[in-house]
């Protein structure tokens, strides 16, 4: 493993290439580069906990100490210094000193035998996510996965570190996503200290798996939108609009209006922002998400409020003194600022509620999606990375799952059409079915070395009568996601 290249991939040119003084590899004719940022490194977990470390400002200094450090800060700070005369205790690794955000990382902590996972489990979950980790490191009690950005996000103090706040939301959503199925430490610092890549701990590395901040942000917004809001034993009807206040038509009408002012007293800018914030609160969004969106809303206004006023309004909405935005008051706001002709039908969508469905054992009919869960679990249990498919019979599947014959046939066709499984049926007395999940096949390919992939893909193509391009294109989708719009200005300014 080329560890210097791994380090360079993570750091995104955030440090100098060569040491400013006493460089052993910089030529005499090459001038020292202009000062950039700094990171912190530690030679053991004990030293890290005690704060005993070193400040590094060049990649050369990292490479000189290859395999002697155990921890580092993969995100770059504006400066680093020491808190004592002996230069033993580091100082400066605080969020308000961040210079650039290079990567998100997740700490998978295994505390019991039941929680035992492998790097393959992380990759499998990542395939579902649609964003692959750039790097997976083995630690004493588990793993750490790095999701390195395509380009770094530069932090600016001018906007009260909005980029850090936005990145925190993304980082938390990534951790919560993986935490649904794997043992994730949800409490560790988002941009703090992590395991450093070494020759003895890198389990997986692919520099092609890097995505833009905008892509992560778009995904994160959807994740936040999907976070549920429960009410006793009731749930919102699937597909019903208006299930949350942020889904109501009035919310978008107010959110995209820009000509508010304070001259109308009770129905001015402050009231509109407070009402929008209440909608975020009642819909189950975090205060960080609401604050970020209210900053964006405020920036669009012809007469924006001061940022400290925005923070004050959001915190008031999240004080738990209110349940949500008042319907009557919403109507007044929309008529005052959007259009006086608006009616309740234009602004609100009636909600529908129903009780939780019975347990499967108590029902006469089982939904196809539930049979899908059973079948996918069965495939996963009977196959692994090294043999990602299983040979069996439809009869055996029916007996194991208790699924009716016609339902199984329909399920197989649906899953194949949705490109979730591959299967091949061999007729006759000695026939059967060869079955594999697309996810398992992709994972087995990802784990192979590049020179082995070609022959392996050919073998899979022959086994399942597949077009080779489908597997290759699917891999490419993971590695080469479509380019998105340029990043927002607030992420591109440097305070250095």
UniProtKB/Swiss-Prot annotation:
Record bears the keyword Nucleotide-binding: no
Any one GO BP annotation for this protein: DNA replication
DNA-binding stretch(es), residue numbering of this chain: 120-141
Annotated GO MF terms: DNA binding
Keywords: DNA replication, DNA-binding, Plasmid
Pfam families: PriCT_1
Top-level taxon: Bacteria
Function in brief: Essential for replication.
Name under which the protein is recorded: Protein RepR
Naturally occurring in which organism (per UniProt): Streptococcus agalactiae
């Amino acid at each position: 493993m080329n560890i210097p290249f791994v380090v360079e991939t993570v750091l995104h040119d955030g440090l100098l290439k060569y040491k400013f003084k006493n460089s052993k590899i910089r030529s005499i004719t090459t001038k020292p580069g202009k000062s950039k940022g700094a990171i912190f490194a530690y030679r053991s977990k004990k030293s890290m906990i005690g704060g005993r470390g070193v400040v590094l400002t060049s990649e050369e200094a990292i490479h000189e100490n290859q395999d002697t450090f155990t921890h580092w800060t993969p995100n770059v700070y504006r400066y680093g210094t020491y808190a004592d005369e002996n230069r033993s205790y580091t100082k400066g690794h605080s969020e308000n000193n961040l210079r650039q955000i290079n990567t998100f990382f997740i700490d998978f902590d295994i505390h019991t035998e039941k929680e035992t996972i492998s790097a393959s489990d992380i990759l499998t979950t990542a395939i579902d996510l649609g964003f692959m980790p750039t790097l997976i490191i083995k630690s004493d009690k588990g793993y750490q996965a790095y999701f390195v950005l395509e380009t770094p996000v530069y932090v600016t103090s001018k906007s009260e570190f909005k980029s850090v706040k936005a990145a925190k939301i993304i980082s938390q959503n990534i951790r919560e996503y993986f935490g649904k199925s794997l043992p994730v430490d949800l409490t560790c610092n988002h941009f703090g200290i992590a395991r450093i890549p070494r020759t003895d701990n890198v389990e997986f590395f692919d520099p092609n798996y890097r995505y833009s901040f905008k892509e992560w942000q778009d995904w994160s917004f959807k994740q936040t939108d999907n976070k549920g809001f429960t009410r006793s034993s009731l749930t919102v009807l699937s597909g019903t609009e208006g299930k949350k206040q942020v889904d109501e038509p009035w919310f978008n009408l107010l959110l995209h209006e820009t000509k508010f002012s304070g001259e109308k007293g009770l129905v001015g800018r402050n009231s509109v922002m407070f009402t929008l914030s209440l909608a975020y609160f009642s819909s189950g969004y975090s205060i960080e998400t609401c604050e970020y969106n209210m900053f964006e809303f405020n920036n669009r206004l012809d007469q924006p409020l001061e940022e400290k006023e925005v923070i004050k309004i959001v915190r008031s909405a999240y004080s738990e003194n209110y349940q949500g935005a008042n319907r009557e008051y919403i109507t007044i706001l929309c008529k005052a600022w959007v259009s006086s002709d608006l009616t309740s039908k234009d602004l609100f969508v009636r909600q529908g509620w129903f009780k939780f469905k019975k347990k499967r054992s108590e029902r006469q009919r089982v939904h196809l999606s539930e049979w899908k869960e059973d079948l996918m679990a069965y495939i996963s249990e009977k196959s692994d990375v090294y043999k990602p498919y299983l040979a069996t019979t439809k009869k055996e599947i029916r007996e194991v799952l208790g699924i009716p014959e016609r339902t199984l046939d329909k399920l197989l066709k649906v899953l194949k059409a949705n490109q979730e499984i591959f299967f091949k049926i061999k007729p006759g007395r000695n026939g059967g079915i060869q079955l594999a999940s697309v996810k398992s096949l992709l994972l087995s390919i990802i784990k192979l070395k590049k020179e082995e992939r070609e022959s392996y893909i050919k073998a899979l193509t022959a086994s399942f009568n597949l077009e080779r391009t489908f597997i290759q294109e699917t891999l490419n989708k993971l590695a080469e996601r479509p380019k998105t719009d340029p990043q927002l200005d607030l992420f591109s300014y440097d305070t250095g």
